[in-house]
Amino acid sequence: MALEYPEELKYLDSHEYLRVEGDTVVVGVTSYAVDQLGDIVFVSLPEEGDRINRGDSFGSIESVKAVEELYAPLSGTVLSVNTVAVEDPALIGSDPYGDGWLIKVRLADPADELGETMTAEEYRERVEG
């Protein structure tokens, strides 16, 4: 898969992306993370209605190479979990920015939550040098 970094998204050092939709944010893993992990075979995510706090583990992603904890990039309430990706984790690898998203979160405080993100160009420079 080609490494892509859609311009409309925000990116984090943890190789997660954020798609901001008002006070709701879609969280997923970047194509760079997918490339590093290899074939994804299992994902564990929180339940709808769970509260997540920035920096805390909210799940894990398992590939043929490793098991990685997923750390919350922001604080808020989980509005939706991508159950299709839970049932078919390979979807995260084949379409990370589309059908392979992980969770949707309502931000606890939108003004405070999005300050530590990078643009697509900044992220590309970070991971590709």
Swiss-Prot record:
Q: What GO CC terms are in its UniProt record?
A: cytosol; glycine cleavage complex
Write one Pfam family the protein is assigned to.
GCV_H
**Source species, please?**
Gloeobacter violaceus (strain ATCC 29082 / PCC 7421)
Q: How is the cofactor bound?
A: Binds 1 lipoyl cofactor covalently.
HAMAP family linked: GcvH
Protein name per UniProt: Glycine cleavage system H protein
Q: Which family does it belong to?
A: Belongs to the GcvH family.
Encoding gene, per UniProt annotation: gcvH
Keyword set, alphabetical order: Lipoyl
Q: Where in this protein does the record say N6-lipoyllysine is found?
A: K65
Query: What does it do?
Result: The glycine cleavage system catalyzes the degradation of glycine. The H protein shuttles the methylamine group of glycine from the P protein to the T protein.
